[in-house]
Amino acid sequence: IRDFCLSRGLGDVYKRQRDDKGVFIKDFKADDYTPHICESNGWQYFWSVQHDVDGLVNLVGGKNRFAEKLDSMFTYHPSEDDELPLFSTGMIGQYAHGNEPSHHVIYLFNSIGFNDRTQYYVAKVMNELYKNEPAGLCGNEDCGQMSAWYVFSAMGFYPVNPVSGRYEIGTPLFPEIKLHLANGKTF
């Protein structure tokens, strides 16, 4: 995995930013919102290796350590005096459902066999952060991503790495779904 380095305060690993000369930013704190990270923070971008989740699991120290770190994403809450950007909405700990960089994170529990946690958080987000009303989204509907997440999740699966053709199982809202494909077939 490129562009990772170990930041061993408490044994944690985070994705760290570099300045314009390629030097890692000093005094890095994963929960800071800085100009070095677009619309997010180190907690949220840490998981942005959808193409190599197994490599990230190994970097962190294996499945159990990965599960602990992933759990902490949802339980480590911003403090009251943190200056969160406008788009930090739909927060569950450091998970910001109101902004796209976090959307796939819930489904990463599946990659280490903790499917029940994926199912728990998918249901929590669908039931608590979406409303059937004009302003029913908890964040910015960039290119339809908020709605796409909900539609995929309501059907019970999600493309963590969209280019792989692989889908992760979640928590379907319906006992049966039938998709009518452009080629006339149904799925």
What are these regions (language model features)?
Residues 1-14:
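Single conserved hydrophobic/aromatic residue that forms the stacking wall/gate
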